[in-house]
Structure formats: structure tokens, C-alpha cells
């Protein structure tokens, strides 16, 4: 009550905003007469004038009235379309980074041209996002005429385009595309090895069409790029028998030598080959054709074979059947070492699982591994400014505000709505409901009134189609199976007597025009004459008037959707631009929503009345019961999205750190200093395990350190001799000496290639190592996410446990990147530039050629997370990387909130 009184006194927030926008509309209208007097060249020159103003520091808000007036005038000249005042308001809402709720038929496609033009003047690009490729291509071509007239370029990104084509599209002033394609291109850019492979140039301003569908309905599952993990079954098969020919040796700590072919480190579950073992393995690999005579395992082109050798050694010597794993249904299933339970679906990494499969003679499974992943929430929140349009956003206004900081503004219609929304009819069962729909359609179609029947599934659309065929009712069906015919079917749906069956989402973005789509009819003719066009227009006017007289488009909903928004979208197909129309939903107690949520009161009442199958009830209590059910489902789905976002925010913080550092590394010409810092860090960490900080010499394990340096980094240093020769070689000086000697050896090795080749090689090794370890980390994070809920049974908060464990895993990921990068560069043998070329060629061959871009259909939250586990020569300046966050000093607190210094946490790679 008090709120209503307050609104009467001061007006609602929406009304106050509209009042403010109308003042701008008056300014724009005042310019219309003067701008209509300008020549085409004078109007086009306004674009350069606006750009010069912006360069002088004038804000976009200041030039908005003039810019909108220019676009309106260009629309009249180029397309014969004038922006209504309400469309100007819609454009202002979008420019301010809000959601513009405009009813179907209010011309949202034309509305987008206003803020798109204004924001493109800054030169930073505008992305216009649609729900499918057809609409993206159509709108880019259609609205591109207007932008081109004003001197701006337009691009469209579509699935299947080459990198060159996409780069050109993203470099345009205004780029159209689908939500999936923008998201996948962002992920692909952050998987690129070379800067020139990237296609995007940042996230500046986005206008999302059908924003409720994209940011709400499709936000329950992440975008995933996946590919085969390590499809090298033949290598595992060839390695399998080699291991059996090796003999276990023992370490002699006094002589610092090892007998046999390998030694076992039980503590770390690792196998180390002796010099003799290396020679024997190389000889065996020559025999099976994996090496040529005289080749070394540590040659640049062969070094990756060590992974398969190590995996086979570990599979045979460290992992025992019925202790570490079992073989069940011809598959290797891991046994949890702490609980003894089977861990179905979990697989060891680094090729170990495939090696065990080869050992046991079961099929070696080709795995799909997640390469990159992001949710729509976290992708779209990267834009400096985000806006959206839809006919149905107000019901989700709270979620838009809390998740995306987007305010919903309801824009008034250009003409007063005349649609009549009739009460729902509820039947006892589906058969009675469908029979009633058929009867209604059969009667109405005789009058010449067009009908659109909306269904929630393809299956129901086909059932209704077969019933219509039996009754001899001519009709068209629009569902996913007729996607290519979508525009044609929708174009005819407003003709007199037309009957169209459509799934709820099909055809969104294309208006149903009463009398049929005049523009498409004219476009279908080859070089039509003026007389033909005049005749088509006259015929269309007759059809249009006939349909208006019959009551406009009738929309029949065959069942209620879980979301009120989807129902409102279906209703919105009728009554566009002040046209008449009528809508009604036909329901049954067998419908999913009614069966799951409708109150027993409704069901019992219908039974007591003794209603028959083909009789319907029409009552306010039924409508309220349905609305309560829909609100319950909406809350459930909102909770799912919030839960997904809460967990993904943890991954997102890590993703931002990795992608930002990766992009900075890609822009660096010379990473040698970074490599030196990584080597220093790895050696310091290694030394800490054998020479604890602050310890005395008697506590040092010098032999262990010598062995570790030799096995892990190929560094044979006589540390014991150094200590004998120099009694002043204490902990700190010893550390400095080892680091200096390691650096000198590395530089001598790299001296055989020129500096440019060396820098290129070092950067590629570092980036590929980051990518490899990031993939492993993503899969580990996914596994953690799937099972963390079990912590709840131990009275622990799963989210807090997930956050803490994820932080530990991220630190381990950074350590692995450092260690593997240093190990690869230390162990690799470089004789000349040819070896570098061989290494690069090998990496290209091992990189999956076909990566799968996948956005799973929205399911429950657990299903969504389970699913998550699953040629260009261009100027690199076109895709310049922009730092997303302020530069952090190495001694500053880490922005991730760990409490550590940046250099000791997320800055380890830099």
C-alpha cells in the first residue's frame, strides 16, 4: 500500500527514466527538419565530425542527439524506414548499458542501429549478438547498408569461417554474430600460440538481441572447446613390450651410481632411467621404428617420446592390478587409495591410464579433453558495456540486475496494443486437449483468420501436424528440422487462412506480418518492374485489411512452458505494432508442468465435476495455480544458474590470470629473462628439499640433490667436490653457484642458434606447456566440481572446500608449468635451427586438428557440470592484446586474495 502511494507521488523508476529519455527525443526531433535538408555527402560527413569531437574528449552522451538524428535520417534515405520516437528511447536505453524491453514487432533490429552507430564512433568495435547464424547474416546485410552509407564497416562472424575471414569481421566497426560464436572465438584466441592467430580485438560494447534467451535460458551450461586428449594408441602398444626387457637397479649413494636400467622412487611414484637404461630403451625404439640409428630420446624431435616411455614404466612397475585399479567390463577402473572405492569415470593423466590399458590388453580409449571453457555469465561480464533487447525481460529483472548489473527498462509501444489474451482452457487429458485444438483451428480457419499454434517440443508439433493432415487442414510446420525454411514459413504465417505450427523458440527475430511479408515477396522476384511492385503492394493491402477485419493473428499455446517468459514470447507473436490479435492456451492435467506442480485442488475439483475428456474448465483459480507452478520452476532454475556461477567464478578468476599472463607472454619478443627466472625458481625449490633453509651442512643431503638435478634437469654437477674445494660455499652461495652454472650450460647449448630463433623457441615451449597443464588443470577442476558435494555429508561446506582445494590445485598447476618448461628446455638437445623446426613440426602434428566447440543443452546443474568434463597470415597489429587488469608489481599483494606476494602466487609465470 505504502509503495503504491509512493509511486503515485514520485512515479516508478521506469517512469522517471522514460521522462528523461523523452527530453532527448525532443532534441532529436528538433534536428530532423534541418538534417533532412542536408545532401548525402553532408550527412555522411557527420561521421568524421563526430569522430573528431570524440578525439577531443567530447563524450558520447553529448553527441547522442545529433548522432541519433543522423541515423534516423540515413534510415529514411537508405532503407525507407524512419525510427519512431519509442525506437529512439529503446536506443538510448541500450546506449546506457541497460536492457530495453520492447514488445514483438516494435522494430528491435532497427533500434540497434542507433547505439551501434554511436558507440562504433570510438573505434573500439561494437558486437551485435543474435540467436542464430541466419539472423546474424540477415541483420548484417540489411543494417550494413545504413552503416555503409554513413562510412562505417560491418562484419559478420559465422561458424565455419576461416581465421582471415573472422579477423576481417572483428576489425569492422560493427560485428554481427551469434552468442556461441563470440564465446568460442574468445576461447580459441586464448588457445593461440602466435599473436597473429587471434581474431578478436577485445570486448568493448555488446548489444544482445533476445537477451533473455541468451543470458538466462542458455546460461545454465558452459561453452566448451574439447578435443582428443592423447590419441596415440599405437605408441602405447609399441612401448608396452619394451618395459619388460628392462632390469631394476639399485642406488649406491657412496659412488653416486645406479646399477640396472632404472631405479624406483617409491615416495613420489616415479621411475628414473639410468644411463644404461636410456641406451637400452633407445636401442629398443630403433628396433620398433620409432627412432633411427644414432638418434637420441632427447633430440628435439623425439623428446615427447619420453612421456610414453615414462607412462609405460610407471604402469608396469608402480601400479598394480586389484590394488591401484581393477579391470571391469573391459575397462580400467581406478581404486581410491584411501577408501578402496571404485572411481568410475576418473582417468589418470599424462598418458598413464592409456599405458595401463595397454598393459592389461583392454581397448585404449580415445579421450575427449576440455581445452577451454567459460559460462555466458563470465564471458559477457567482460564487456566494458553490455546491453540487450527483448520483448520479455521484466519477469527476470532481478536476475539481470544481480548477475549482470543490467537494469530493465520497459519501453512503451509505438501504438496502443489491441491483443486480446483469453483465459486458459484446462482439459482432463492430452487427447481431449489436442482434439479441442483441432476443432478450434478447423472452425477459425474457415473465417480466413491466420493461426499460429505454439508447441513446447518437436514431438508435439509433429503429432499436431498429423492430426491436422487427417482433418484436411493445410498447414506449415516450423521446428528445428525445418530451420532453413524458417524465414519463408514465418513470412507466410500472417496470410489469410494460414495455419502454422511452431516450437516456442522457432522463428524468434522474424515478425509475423498480417497479410504476409511484403518485403520478402518483392525480394523473391528477379528484377521486378514498378508495375509488378505496385500490384504486389495492392494485393498485400487487400490481404492485410482482410486479416485485420477477421481479428488479426490467433495464437494457440498447446501447453504452458516452465517459464512465464516463454509463454509471453509466444503471445507476443500476435498484436504487433497495434494490430489486433487473440491468444489462448490449451492445457491438460497430463502436461508436464501441470502434472509436476499444479495443486491437487484443481485436479480434485475437475474430477468432482464429472468432466469428460473433451470438456474444459476456465477458472481464475486454475490460472493462479499455474502461475505459482511457473514461479516455483523459475526459482529452481535461477538457483541452478546462481550455483553454477558461484562455482565458475572460482575457475574464472584462475582463467583470467592464465589468459592475461598468456597474452602478455605472446606479446613479448624475448622471454629469456622469464625462462631464467623460472629456472632459478625450480632449482631453489629443488634445493629446499635437500638443503633446508637455515640448516647446517651436516643436515644436507648433497647426494640426493646431485641425483635429482641429473635426473630431472640433466645437470651433472659435482656439488660434493665444490664443497670440499670451497669451505666458504654456504647455502646461499651454493644456490647462486648452481643457478649460475645451470644458466651457463643452457646458454652454451642455445648458442648454436641465432637469438631470434631461440626467443621464438623458448616462447613456444612456454606457451605450449601452459596450454598442456591448463588442460590437465581444467579436467582436475571438473572432477573436483563433480564430487565436492560429498563434503556435505562430512558437515563441511562444499563451496568453501571447493574454493580452498581449487586454490591449492592452481598453485600446483603453476608449479607444474614452471617445472615442465625448465625440464623441457634443459633436457632438449639442440644442434642447430633444424632441430627447432623439427620440434615445432612435431608439436603441430601432435596438436588435434579438429577441436569440437560444444554448448550442451541446458539440464540440471549436475548434468551441466558433468558435460563440462567432457590457416592465416595477417598483420598481428590487428589483434593487439589489451591488458584487462591493472599491472601488479611483483612484490604487491596478489589480487586473487591469497594474502601472498604476487611473485609467489599468480605471478610465478611472469
From Swiss-Prot:
InterPro entries attached to this UniProt entry: Helicase_ATP-bd, Helicase_C-like, P-loop_NTPase, SEC_C_motif, SecA, SecA_CS, SecA_DEAD, SecA_motor_DEAD
Q: Please name every pair of cysteines joined by a disulfide bond in this record.
A: none
> Where does it localize?
Cell inner membrane; Cytoplasm
| Catalytic reactions on record | ATP + H2O + cellular proteinSide 1 = ADP + phosphate + cellular proteinSide 2
Q: Which GO terms describe its molecular function?
A: ATP binding; metal ion binding; protein-exporting ATPase activity
**Keyword terms:** ATP-binding, Cell inner membrane, Cell membrane, Cytoplasm, Membrane, Metal-binding, Nucleotide-binding, Protein transport, Translocase, Translocation, Transport, Zinc
Q: What are the Basic and acidic residues biased-composition ranges? A: 880-890
Q: Which cofactor does it need?
A: Zn(2+)
Pfam families, A to Z = P-loop_SecA, SEC-C, SecA_DEAD, SecA_PP_bind, SecA_SW
Bilayer topology term = Peripheral membrane protein
The top EC class, named as a word, is translocase
Q: What is its EC number?
A: 7.4.2.8
The cofactor note reads:
May bind 1 zinc ion per subunit.
Q: Which GO terms describe its cellular component?
A: cell envelope Sec protein transport complex; cytosol; plasma membrane
Residues binding ATP, per UniProt = 87, 105-109, 511
Q: How does it assemble?
A: Monomer and homodimer. Part of the essential Sec protein translocation apparatus which comprises SecA, SecYEG and auxiliary proteins SecDF-YajC and YidC.
Kindly provide the name given to this protein in its UniProt entry. Answer: Protein translocase subunit SecA
Q: Which gene encodes it?
A: secA
